[in-house]
Amino acid sequence: MGFDLAETLRSLKPQKRQGTLERRVDDDLPWADDEPTIGGPLFLDTTVYLDVLQGRSPGAVDTLLTYRLCHHSAVCLSELTRLNPKHASTKTVLETIEATLDDIPEHRLHTPDVAIWGQAGVLAGLLFRLSNLPKGEGHQRRFVNDALVFLQARQLGASVLTGNIRDFDYLSQLVPTGRIILYRSPAASRRLASG
């Protein structure tokens, strides 16, 4: 089948993890601004597509996207195409997304395999339990998608490039062998400075 539940449980040790995850301070996190221009491959999270398409990606992210090898996930494709068909801008947004997807080389678009799906389920369950969020608000599904992207990147030896700071910080705490590169969009940076 390709998924070894016993090995995944041995590796993640969900039964031994207690308490609540806490986001690390910014100085302890890997930021796009601190990354060398030339480096290892990137695995793009959905936040990257949204920020680039809306013109709000920071310069450091744009530079990394220009010079680094970029891989893509079918999980993000799924997230990008969940739109309300009745919304006035949906047709235009879908055209933009379609053009973006057409630019992705087929050999750089990856689908999670059975092992990654199984591991992601265990990891997402652990993340949900340790994040202490309320049930029934969609967090579990979001965590499965984040875990899929994180584990796919790890499998490829790539770093996840993402603006989803909290969730990917948590994932990298739970699986320290996965790599992440974080950023804040300029709008998010302004909100932090004023708040």
Q: Predicted regions span which residues?
A:
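Phosphate- and divalent-cation-binding pockets in alpha/beta enzyme and binding domains
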Residues: 79, 119, 170-171
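Acidic, PIN/NYN-like endoribonuclease modules and their adjacent C-terminal/linker elements
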Residues: 1-35, 150, 154-195
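Short active-site oxyanion
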Residues: 39-40, 68-69, 106-108, 154-159
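Active-site neighborhoods of divalent-metal-dependent phosphate/nucleic-acid chemistry enzymes
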Residues: 2-6, 26-28, 109-159, 163
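Short, well-structured N-terminal submotif of metal-dependent ribonuclease cores
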Residues: 1-99
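Generic detector of contiguous secondary-structure segments
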Residues: 61, 96-118
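Short, hinge-like loop/turn segments at secondary-structure boundaries
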Residues: 87-91, 127-128, 178-180
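Alpha-helix capping/helix-boundary segments
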Residues: 48-49, 76, 116, 149, ...
